[in-house]
A protein has these predicted regions:
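Elongated, amphipathic alpha-helical interaction scaffolds
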Residues: 2-189
Length: 189
């Protein structure tokens, strides 16, 4: 679906003949602007098929200051809230970063923490979905497939204990291998 979104965007906007969505400005243009939000919605609905049905998104401020003066702030590539109040972060990481999985967790945690409000609050949290495009193959022993989904799960029962946090890693370098395997599955039966 991503290919079709990018192709449609280029045709509609008469942008440059080629646009590389792995480049920061292009990624933010494709996924993080009002006039291209249909591309983001289509992509997210496909990625979270049967879990999310997004009809609209509202783009939120991408820069969040630290909670205290000495805390590090964050700058999301794309940050939006769905029509159902679910928070979505979409990141593109071109170069390998040793602690990228930790960074994604930190970004997700920041989106969760910022939901806390002063005064009377019942601790009800909106779900936060973080999607990480990675243009490298991670050295992490956990991230070995094209797509890896992380959720809060009980180790013993393997049951999901909360739907309030989900991180999806998409390793673009493994896409061809993934597509080849998917095609073989279709032909095998």
């Amino acid at each position: 679906e991503l290919q079709y979104c990018v192709h449609d965007l280029i045709k509609r906007k008469k942008m440059a003949r080629f646009i590389d969505p792995r480049v920061d400005w292009a990624f933010k243009r494709i996924f993080g602007s009002e006039d291209t939000k249909e591309c983001l919605i289509t992509f997210l609905n496909g990625l979270f098929e049967d879990e999310l049905v997004i009809k609209d998104v509202t783009f939120a401020k991408t820069e969040k200051l630290g909670l205290r003066p000495d805390d590090r702030g964050v700058v999301f590539d794309v940050y939006c809230i769905t029509n159902e109040g679910k928070h979505v972060i979409v990141e593109m990481q071109k170069k390998e970063q040793e602690y990228f999985a930790d960074r994604a967790l930190y970004y997700t945690a920041r989106a969760i923490v910022q939901q806390g409000i002063r005064g009377i609050w019942d601790y009800h949290l909106a779900p936060v979905y973080t999607v990480c495009f990675m243009d490298f193959v991670s050295q992490s022993p956990i991230l070995k497939e094209f797509r890896t989904d992380l959720v809060l799960t009980d180790l013993q029962t393997r049951q999901r204990v909360s739907d309030r946090m989900r991180i999806v890693y998409l390793q673009l370098q493994l896409l061809d291998k993934h597509m080849e395997a998917a095609c073989m599955d279709i032909f095998d039966g």
